């Protein structure tokens, strides 16, 4: 276990108000005076704090006799944090993620002694650059790697210890209002030399492995970024449009979330909701029958098929829109998907509506054989009539991943083709190309930015602008808001 000296951006008053914690919540060593003993695995490492005025000074004497700065941390063992809030008050926070223990001590006497002696000890060793360098590296180097770990642990166990779901959210979407955000000391010291530190690597690896190990156990609390492996609090992830708060990576969105993002509230009118596949070629599978697999995805996603189609308003402009869902059999295009998209385009043709297709697919569905390949021609034929004969406007939005038959048909037929940042866009996947051609595919050659520079599509639009850009395009082409 590692120990850290932290400053907290959450005051004692806020902590008590949000989490319903009293000034002394059964802290380490039971300083609250409660008769009920507190037991945890760290008692052997945490020295006696019992009694308001009877602290053992043997610990303080030991602090003064340390041979190295590293041993200072033995005074605060396990997951115990010395915290100073924005008001300058000090307290300790202890949490044990395995045994589900969360304790806070707000007694300022001992912590004041600890802080004073800690500062005195550093002053005594101020002549040694090695000691200061070790301390600087130990305290400052790991702010980024431990930020999410501390936030998620404290946030989770405040809820579990107080049985209050409402203590997390106060009506604000700002994550800094909902987490206990901690940072290592002050901003002015962040520029300290870190190049030769071995601690940075070891602690960063420890934090990353801890996140990975706990991802399954606490998967209901967070979403892990597939790019940087940072943790994003699940409760607020949808409000952040599934964008990683750490690196800005655009993670996959469900079709329902995309409809909520693009369509004005109260204007969504779905089409052909109950159209389902009937296994037209009676596909044989030794593992799971095709119909059973369809049923399992329907239960898992709540959708009838891999695409949702309908009409609605985008910033007041009536549109027809189809949104593919990669969670439903990889967004594969079967006969039902092709039929729903074709009907949507024909409906928009008859009513002179602009069309948006949001693509997220692995390609044609192999369980339907040549019938799935026919959908490419059928949709393309409907689009030809829509674009060439009726002179209407079609916008294609390519998200990650867009591959196979979708890329080879309606995905690349838009009058304007928009891509999301870092979207995986290709006809054949990297593994298929390498196995077929026996050649290595260069890293990054199938992401949106690479294809953009080759002229494959038009703009790359971040998700937070994805509603505004099509709206401006529609108005430029003569489609305006209607009451």
From Swiss-Prot:
Keyword Zinc in the entry? The reply is yes
Q: Which PROSITE patterns match?
A: COA_CT_NTER
Q: Which residues form a coiled coil?
A: none
Q: Which NCBIfam families does its entry note?
A: accD
Where, subcellularly, is it found? Answer: Plastid, Chloroplast stroma
Q: Which reaction does it catalyse?
A: N(6)-carboxybiotinyl-L-lysyl-[protein] + acetyl-CoA = N(6)-biotinyl-L-lysyl-[protein] + malonyl-CoA
Query: How does this polypeptide assemble, per the annotation?
Result: Acetyl-CoA carboxylase is a heterohexamer composed of biotin carboxyl carrier protein, biotin carboxylase and 2 subunits each of ACCase subunit alpha and ACCase plastid-coded subunit beta (accD).
Cofactor(s) listed:
Zn(2+)
EC number(s) per UniProt? 2.1.3.15
Question: Cross-referenced SUPFAM superfamilies, in alphabetical order?
Answer: ClpP/crotonase
Recorded metabolic or biological pathway in which this protein acts: Lipid metabolism; malonyl-CoA biosynthesis; malonyl-CoA from acetyl-CoA: step 1/1
- The name on file for this protein is Acetyl-coenzyme A carboxylase carboxyl transferase subunit beta, chloroplastic
- Give the record's cofactor note, including how many are bound: Binds 1 zinc ion per subunit.
Q: Which UniProt keywords apply?
A: ATP-binding, Chloroplast, Fatty acid biosynthesis, Fatty acid metabolism, Lipid biosynthesis, Lipid metabolism, Metal-binding, Nucleotide-binding, Plastid, Transferase, Zinc, Zinc-finger
């Amino acid at each position: 276990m590692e120990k850290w000296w932290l400053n907290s951006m959450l005051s004692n008053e806020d902590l008590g108000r949000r989490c319903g914690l009293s000034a002394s919540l059964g802290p380490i060593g039971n300083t609250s005076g409660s008769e009920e003993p507190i037991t945890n695995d760290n008692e052997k490492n945490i020295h006696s704090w019992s009694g308001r005025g009877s602290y053992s000074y043997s610990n303080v004497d030991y602090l003064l006799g340390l041979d190295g700065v590293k041993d200072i941390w033995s005074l605060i063992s396990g997951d115990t944090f010395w915290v100073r809030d924005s008001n300058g008050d000090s307290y300790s926070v202890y949490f044990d993620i395995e045994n589900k223990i969360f304790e806070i001590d707000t007694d300022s006497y001992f912590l004041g002694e600890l802080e004073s002696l800690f500062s005195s000890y550093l002053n005594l060793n101020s002549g040694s650059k090695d000691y200061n360098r070790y301390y600087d590296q130990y305290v400052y180097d790991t702010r980024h790697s431990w930020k999410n770990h501390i936030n998620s642990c404290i946030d989770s166990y405040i809820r579990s210890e107080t049985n209050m779901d409402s203590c997390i959210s106060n009506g604000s979407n700002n994550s800094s209002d909902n987490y206990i955000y901690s940072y290592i000391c002050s901003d002015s010291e962040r520029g300290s030399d870190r190049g030769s530190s071995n601690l940075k690597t070891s602690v960063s690896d420890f934090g990353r492995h801890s996140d990975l190990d706990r991802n399954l156990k606490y998967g209901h609390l967070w979403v892990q970024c597939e790019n940087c492996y940072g943790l994003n609090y699940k409760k607020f992830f949808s409000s952040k449009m599934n964008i990683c708060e750490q690196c800005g990576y655009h993670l996959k969105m469900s079709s329902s979330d995309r409809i909520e993002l693009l369509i004005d509230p109260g204007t969504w009118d779905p089409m052909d909701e109950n159209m389902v596949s009937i296994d037209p070629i009676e596909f044989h599978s030794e593992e799971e029958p095709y119909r059973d697999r369809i049923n399992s995805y329907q239960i898992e996603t709540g959708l009838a098929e891999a695409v949702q189609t309908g009409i609605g308003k985008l910033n007041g402009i009536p549109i027809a829109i189809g949104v593919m869902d990669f969670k439903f059999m990889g967004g594969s295009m079967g006969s039902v998907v092709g039929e729903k998209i074709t009907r949507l385009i024909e409906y928009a043709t008859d009513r002179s509506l602009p069309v948006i297709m949001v693509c997220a697919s692995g390609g044609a569905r192999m369980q339907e054989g040549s019938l799935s390949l026919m959908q490419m021609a059928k949709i393309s034929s409907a689009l030809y009539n829509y674009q060439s004969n009726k002179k209407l406007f079609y916008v294609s939005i390519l998200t990650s991943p867009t591959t196979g038959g979708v890329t080879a048909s309606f995905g690349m037929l838009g009058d304007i083709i928009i891509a999301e940042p870092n979207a995986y866009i290709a006809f054949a996947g990297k593994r298929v190309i390498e196995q077929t051609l026996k050649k290595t595919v260069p890293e990054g050659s199938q992401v949106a930015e690479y294809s953009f520079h080759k002229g494959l599509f038009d703009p790359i639009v971040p998700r937070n602008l994805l509603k505004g850009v099509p709206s401006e395009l529609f108005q430029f082409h003569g489609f305006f808001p209607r009451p």
